[in-house]
Structures are given as structure tokens and as C-alpha cells.
């Protein structure tokens, strides 16, 4: 246990938490090479212990990411890096800038470099990387400052391996959820049922997030066509979340796993209302097709699913925002997220400005506290 971590334990605030940030991305200082010490010798050899040096096939191996769509300003805020380092690679700097600077009391970590892990073709390689990352995250971040909380990463390609990793990591201090990088298979399919059973058994929510590999890799999530520009791609990421939400609801996943909780991160929120209304209306006329869905789909959505705020909607007319919050039942289903250190970061001091104070408190604190339970404390 580090000195900083021990000190943080003794000086923990006694008052209520102010802000829980549901989407913060730590990055590995040397990319995949950072994880080499956390792999067996056999896996180091298979993946390529050089990882970036030389010109062998193994040394050129890299994690699936979007290298085709260009954000000319960069995907990261330049000020999120300590001089000489990359953004969000130093837990001390991030703690000073985000936790202290923005008043964040808990930050839930979602692996920045592993967002696209679900697109990797070899399930064993993906599972090995996920396992190594989890050990690194616990040692490098969770032990440094007790305000950090972790999403343990699983590789969705092989549910059996994913369940083993959930069982291995679920009781580690600071773990509050399972981060499941998205895959080509929609989330309602039976492929994921062993993962859902393990998540329910351990009382861990499952969080999904845009992968950064959409329409780029064969096994990545797919949009309805391939966008030309970054702005198109970025604006349409909600398509993936809408498809997965409908899949979860129509396949009756929450009837089969009534205690399962799912977090939909960084995919917009305005679509929640229309999708819920449409599914409820169609359910009345088409429920014979899906008899396992016993109640209105929106009932399951409101009880078992939560949605993070970033990128928060900014309608030209502010009064429309108030109406939207009511339409989507924001006082129950929304959880604040900053998306630190990305370029479209939402500052908690002004992201929800204009909303009633009680609603801000529910989104920033009460909703995630109730959803994550004792693990967040």
C-alpha cells in the first residue's frame, strides 16, 4: 500500500460525497508495453515483449483503435499531461487536476487504451491483455488514491474466460463494475448470458462505452453505414448504444437476470425517450413475438439501466433541456461523467448549469451512489 493511499484513508471526508464521476479514462504510459510485467513469460513471448521495437510481426502488434477518423485538434486535452508524459498516465497529476481541482470525490476508471479490445480476433490474447491491465490498474491507480474506483476489464469474445476474470477480480479493493468493451454481437444475445450471471452473482454492474473501432474492424460494433468524417462518426456513436439497449430489452435479459445492472456510457441521452416510447408502443401490439418481456420495456430500462451524461446535450433553447430531463426520467437514470481527459470533457462546475439544484445532486451523486451501492463508498 502506498503512503499516499494510506494517508488518503486516514483523511477521508466524513461528510457526504459531492460528485461521483462515472467515466474517467486512465492511460498506460508506454501503451501495451506497460502491461508486459503483468504477463507470464509465455505470453510476453507470444505477444512480443519488444512491443514497438524492430520490424517483426510481434513487435508491431497493437491494440485496436480508430486510426482512420481524424480529429485535427487531437482527442485529448493538452493540459491533462504532466510535462514529458502523455495525458492521464500519472495518477498523482490526475488526482490533483481532476479530483482536487474539479471537486470529484470518486472517479470510476474505464480503460482508455482498451476501449476497442472487443474487436480483437483472438479471444485468448484479448483476455490476457484484460487480465494484465486489471492488475496494473489496481497497483498503479487504485492503490494510489482511494478516490479512484475501477471497472475491471473483460474480453467479451470468450464468455468463459470473461467469467474467470470476473471471479478473480470481483473482490479486489476499489472495483465497482465490469467494463465490457463492445463487440460485434448485440448485448441481448445468449452469448453474454454467462457474463451476466457472473455480474449478477457478484453484484457488479456492467458498463459499456463506445469502442473507438466502430466500422473500422470486422469484429467491432457497426453503424448503419460507414461515415466519411470524424464529426459524422462522433455524432452517430449513439446508434450503437440504441441498438444494444433495444437488444437487452427485447431479449428479456432483465427478466432472466433481474438483479443485473447496465451502465451505458458516452452515447448521448436524448434518444432514450424516443426509444422507450417506441418500444412501449410496439410492445402492446407485438408482445406475442417476445412473450418473455412481461412488462413495458421502459420499466426495465428505468430499473436496471443507467446512462452517463457526457457529452451533455446543449439545446439552443434552455427550456428544452428541462423538458428533456423530464422525458427521460433523468432524476433516476442519469449519472454524471466528465470523460476526462478527452477533448470534449464536461466540467462538473458548469456541465449541468441551469438544472434545478436537487436534480443536479441526483445526477452527480445520489443516482450513482444508489446504483453502485457500498462499493462506491
Predicted features along the sequence, with ranges:
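Helix-coil boundary/capping segments in enzymes
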Residues: 1-377
Amino acid at each position: 500500500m502506498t503512503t499516499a493511499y494510506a494517508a488518503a484513508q486516514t483523511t477521508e471526508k466524513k461528510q457526504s460525497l459531492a460528485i461521483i464521476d462515472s467515466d474517467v479514462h486512465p492511460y498506460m504510459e508506454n501503451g501495451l508495453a506497460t502491461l508486459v510485467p503483468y504477463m507470464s513469460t509465455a505470453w510476453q513471448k507470444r505477444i512480443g515483449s519488444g512491443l514497438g521495437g524492430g520490424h517483426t510481426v510481434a513487435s508491431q502488434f497493437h491494440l485496436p483503435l480508430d486510426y482512420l477518423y481524424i480529429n485535427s485538434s487531437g482527442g485529448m486535452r493538452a493540459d491533462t499531461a504532466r510535462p514529458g508524459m502523455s495525458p492521464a498516465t500519472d495518477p498523482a497529476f490526475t488526482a490533483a487536476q481532476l479530483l482536487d481541482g474539479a471537486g470529484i470525490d470518486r472517479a470510476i476508471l474505464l480503460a482508455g487504451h482498451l476501449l476497442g479490445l472487443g474487436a480483437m480476433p483472438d479471444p485468448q490474447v484479448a483476455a490476457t491483455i484484460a487480465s494484465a491491465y486489471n492488475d496494473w490498474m489496481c497497483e498503479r491507480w487504485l492503490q494510489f488514491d482511494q478516490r479512484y474506483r475501477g471497472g475491471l476489464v473483460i474480453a467479451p469474445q470468450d464468455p468463459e474466460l470473461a467469467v474467470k476474470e470476473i471471479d478473480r477480480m470481483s473482490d479486489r479493493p476499489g472495483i465497482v463494475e465490469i467494463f465490457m468493451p463492445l463487440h460485434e454481437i448485440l448485448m441481448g444475445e445468449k452469448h453474454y448470458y454467462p457474463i451476466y450471471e457472473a455480474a449478477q452473482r457478484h453484484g457488479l454492474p456492467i458498463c459499456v462505452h463506445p469502442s473507438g473501432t466502430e466500422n473500422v474492424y470486422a469484429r467491432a460494433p457497426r453503424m448503419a453505414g460507414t461515415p466519411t468524417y470524424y464529426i459524422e462518426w462522433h455524432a452517430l456513436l449513439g446508434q450503437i448504444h440504441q441498438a444494444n439497449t433495444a437488444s437487452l430489452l427485447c431479449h428479456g435479459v432483465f427478466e432472466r437476470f433481474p438483479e443485473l445492472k447496465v451502465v451505458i456510457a458516452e452515447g448521448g441521452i436524448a434518444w432514450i425517450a424516443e426509444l422507450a416510447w417506441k418500444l412501449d408502443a410496439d410492445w402492446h401490439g407485438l408482445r406475442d413475438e417476445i412473450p418473455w418481456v412481461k412488462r413495458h420495456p421502459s420499466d426495465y430500462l428505468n430499473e436496471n439501466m443507467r446512462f452517463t451524461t457526457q457529452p451533455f446535450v446543449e439545446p439552443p433553447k434552455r427550456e428544452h433541456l428541462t423538458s428533456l430531463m423530464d422525458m427521460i426520467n433523468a432524476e433516476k437514470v442519469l449519472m454524471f461523467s466528465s470523460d476526462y481527459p478527452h477533448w470534449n470533457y464536461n466540467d462538473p462546475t458548469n456541465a449541468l448549469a441551469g438544472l434545478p439544484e436537487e436534480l443536479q445532486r441526483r445526477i452527480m451523486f445520489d443516482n450513482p451512489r444508489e446504483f453502485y451501492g457500498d462499493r462506491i463508498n
